[in-house]
Amino acid sequence: MSEKSIVREAKDIRLAMELITLGARLQMLESETQLSRGRLIKLYKELRGSPPPKGMLPFSTDWFMTWEQNIHSSMFYNAYRFLLKSGGSVGIEAVVKAYRLYLEQCPPVKDQEPILALTRAWTLVRFVESGMLQLSVCTKCNGSFITHAHQPASNYVCSLCQPPSRAIKKRKLSANPADINLQLLDGLEQFRM
């Protein structure tokens, strides 16, 4: 009979608390810690004040392909890849650090969830590792973006270089100072010779 390590359990509890605080779903907690489902539910209720949401995890690569989600997913995954290459982090630690970097660069709008939730970011890493998604380089800006695996990359153009028309409409409605500055610059384009 294997004896439970108190140190291992303490690390799992600390990790579970950090993941819950960042918005992880129960399935992610079960996968990344060795704590029982009952203990995780108890911990979740204690930290969040409500039971964890029920239901299956998202299992579609298509979510990552829509223009806005793709930009956010690509930002997260590039941060994750940098952390792996620099040797500073691996596994769930790299996911958490990359997600914190993502939130720092793309803070959610007040009273709204971030576009890329932690569980989706974790799922993205698993999709890339399993070969369902990949990074492709944009032929215009040379940025690396998430695409379907085995998609021809020779003519790939990202949604920043070639935004869909609905993206431009959304930007014009935005109160975000960065978007307003871009709108002003767009307006000045007509005066260029």
Swiss-Prot record:
Signal peptide: none annotated. Its cofactor is Zn(2+). Zn(2+) binds at C138, C141, C158, C161. Pfam families: FlhC. Its main location: cytoplasm. It is found in: Cytoplasm. Transmembrane segments: none annotated. Binds 1 zinc ion per subunit. GO terms for molecular function: DNA binding; zinc ion binding. GO terms for cellular component: cytoplasm. One of its GO terms (biological process) is bacterial-type flagellum organization. Functions in complex with FlhD as a master transcriptional regulator that regulates transcription of several flagellar and non-flagellar operons by binding to their promoter region. Activates expression of class 2 flagellar genes, including fliA, which is a flagellum-specific sigma factor that turns on the class 3 genes. Also regulates genes whose products function in a variety of physiological pathways. Belongs to the FlhC family. HAMAP family: FhlC. This is Flagellar transcriptional regulator FlhC. It comes from Proteus mirabilis. The gene is flhC.
